[in-house]
């Protein structure tokens, strides 16, 4: 596996990979949890949201960076990180690994790469967020194995 900087030619592959990675979360967890009406209101355009968001992830002038993991000639995953808005702080904003490359240390190596890059830029505190659902269990285990501390935060939504 090789980790390298993002190039513009990666963009469509990363968009597709992001949608592939998170489709089960939205279709099999969020949609049944929220029901049709609330899901459509909150996340009905989730694929388009990623199509709009992924192109903004890499902006070195703003301190936002992306690194890509390759296995052979295939993109196996990517990580995006950015400043968090607090002094000396950053965050891993998104980590996506293709289904065919999971459980092969790709996510771990991408996270370590992002942390190392942030440290080199003077960051002393790194945050990362994820869901507390079954879909994100592997991500939580990874982050905890990297020394991150889980902070109990709950979010609620109600139609009124």
Residue spans of the language-model regions?
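Extreme N-terminal starter segment of soluble prokaryotic enzymes
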Residues: 1-3
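Acetyl-CoA-dependent GNAT
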Residues: 5-93, 98, 111-112, 117, ...
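Conserved beta-strand-loop-alpha-helix junction that forms the acyl-donor binding cleft
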Residues: 102, 127-139, 157-160
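Short coil/turn segments at alpha/beta junctions that flank glycine-rich nucleotide-binding fingerprints
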Residues: 104, 121-124
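Conserved active-site alpha-helix within GNAT-family acetyltransferase domains
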Residues: 108, 124, 132-152
